[in-house]
Each structure stands twice: as C-alpha cells, then as structure tokens.
C-alpha cells in the first residue's frame, strides 16, 4: 500500500525502527507538551481562500540568502541519520539535491562531511554548529565547512544544556557505541567532528561572542532557536543574516510556545531586516502555507525526513519532499496564490487566533 501523507511515513518508521531509535527520533523534553503543540497549533489556524483568480500556473520557487530553491520547504538539521538508514546523511543530501532545496547538515552527522558533500556535490548546503567550549575547535570546523562549499553557518542557540528527554534516559541511549561512527580522525587529520560530538556544548556563549564567529567567516550567520521579540531584536542588532524560529522540535525546554505561535512576534520584531525561517510541526502543505503567510521565508522539516529515510533511504526522503511540495502546490492553488510572493497575512483568519 503506498504511503500518501507524512503520517503514513511516521507509522511505517514506528513499526520498523527499533524502540530505542524510535524513542530517540520521536522523543521530546519532559511531558512532550511543546513537541505535540508544534503540530496542534497549526490546526487552530484557518485559511481565507480567494477565488476567480487565474491559477493555471503556480510557481513555488523562492530564494533563501540569495540562493534559489524549488519550493520554500527545506531540510532541518537532525543528527545520526544512520540510525534510520545505512547511508545516513549521504542519502539525505542526495534527496535534497534532487529536489533542488537546502539541506542543513548537523554537527551530529553520522557520515563525514566529505562523504556528504561528495554524495551531492551540486546541492545547496548549510552547516549547523553546536558551539564547542574550545574556540580553536570551532575555528577549525568553520574553516572546514567553508572549504567544503557550505553556504551558511547556522548556530544553534537553544542548547546551553541538553533537555530532559525521559525516553533516552530510560533506554540509556549510547549513540556513539550504537552507530560505531567511522571516518573520524583527529583535528590534525582534518576531521574535528568527534571533538564536537563527544564534548559538551558551550553554556557560556552570549551575544557578544557573535562578533568572534563573524570574524572567522564570510558565510552568512543564521541563529536557530529564537522564540521571542527581545532575542530577535538582539539578533538584528548583532548583524546576523537570518533567524530560524524553533523550539528544537520540543526536545529542549518543554512548555514553550509552538514555533508557529512564536513566528509573528519574531517577524514583527525584525522589521524585514533579516530573513526569518521556521521549523517545528510542519506536516502538510497547508502548514507550509500558513507559516509563509505569517512571515516565514521558508520552512525546515526535521523528523519527517528521518521517517522517509527509514522507509526507503534517499528515495524515501524524496517521496516525503514530493508529498509536501505537491500538497503545498495544491494549497497555493486553492487559496489563489500564483507565486510565493502572493502569500501574505490576508490568507489568515485572525479572528480565530
């Protein structure tokens, strides 16, 4: 039986992955309130379609940081893709390249960056950085991703400490042993990934540190994990190039707002000075449309990509992306939007919010 929506991929992954792997992918912090609210919040939003418009041609293309993508649906950084499929991030990168979208590679990738790039040399790729306490290690990693052709540096800011994920504690998940990570050398050998993956994330990083990162790279810097207008204003003040509104998929601090509920606050605060993106809770084309109508330039998808990997590797990820893109095309057509530029707040029934 074919899988026709992202929920189908979720159920397939739940049935076929080991319990510890499923718990790791699906888990949220504490009571998982925020994880679940990320999806539920979208369903509270109603659309205001416009009709009798010529929608015989609908163009989903847009740009992020100046690069064109086929649709405003890209791949969020998630770690350890080999948990879901043997080729891991290489399969993910190939699917993203085939779909002409951006893939943000995680610090916690289970394939070497060289192998990921070689698998999809023409793909648009950004790199997500967890800040290491050792500045020299950060510097080497930034230089490495620049040399490999990554086009942006995404700094995750919402993990000064790893959230309390009860399933991982219960399962005593030891990802390093389970994955048997290979291709990991020393910094002298040009691969610093294991030093990130086996060390704590720097809890001391603050706004003033951003200037150091900016001095280390010419890449645009995107901050991932912003949820408030205060932090959005500070991000603009410190000259970042973009913000990903995110609560880490509900895996960090529980009982914070759903990403879509925080989006309008952040969009209003930046006043168009930087691009704003969203991750968290995207499961349908309508979800994508709602996020764009509320001001997101693009959305990033996390868990569904791993579900696609678990189904059929590269081809499973491509199927997930194709379903989302086809649904989004339908949503645009049925609301009278002929281009992404025509998607705006007029589509949202604010009296319900």
UniProtKB/Swiss-Prot annotation:
Catalytic function, reaction form: a (2S)-2-hydroxycarboxylate + O2 = a 2-oxocarboxylate + H2O2; 2-hydroxyhexadecanoate + O2 = 2-oxohexadecanoate + H2O2; 2-hydroxyoctanoate + O2 = 2-oxooctanoate + H2O2
Binding residues annotated for a 2-oxocarboxylate, in chain numbering: 130, 165, 251
Record's keyword annotation contains Oxidoreductase: yes
Domain spans labelled FMN hydroxy acid dehydrogenase: 2-353
Keywords linked to the UniProt accession: Fatty acid metabolism, Flavoprotein, FMN, Lipid metabolism, Oxidoreductase, Peroxisome
Active-site residue list: 248 (proton acceptor)
Coiled-coil intervals, chain numbering: none
Entries under Pfam families matching the protein: FMN_dh (PF01070)
EC number(s) stated in the UniProt entry for this protein: 1.1.3.15
Motif (Microbody targeting signal): 351-353
Classification via PROSITE patterns: FMN_HYDROXY_ACID_DH_1, FMN_HYDROXY_ACID_DH_2
Residue numbers binding FMN: 77-79, 106, 128, 156, 224, 279-283, 302-303
Entry's family note: Belongs to the FMN-dependent alpha-hydroxy acid dehydrogenase family.
Main function: Oxidase that catalyzes the oxidation of medium and long chain hydroxyacids such as 2-hydroxyhexadecanoate and 2-hydroxyoctanoate, to the correspondong 2-oxoacids. Its role in the oxidation of 2-hydroxy fatty acids may contribute to the general pathway of fatty acid alpha-oxidation. Active in vitro with the artificial electron acceptor 2,6-dichlorophenolindophenol (DCIP), but O2 is believed to be the physiological electron acceptor, leading to the production of H2O2.
Subunit architecture: Homotetramer.
Name this polypeptide is given: 2-Hydroxyacid oxidase 2
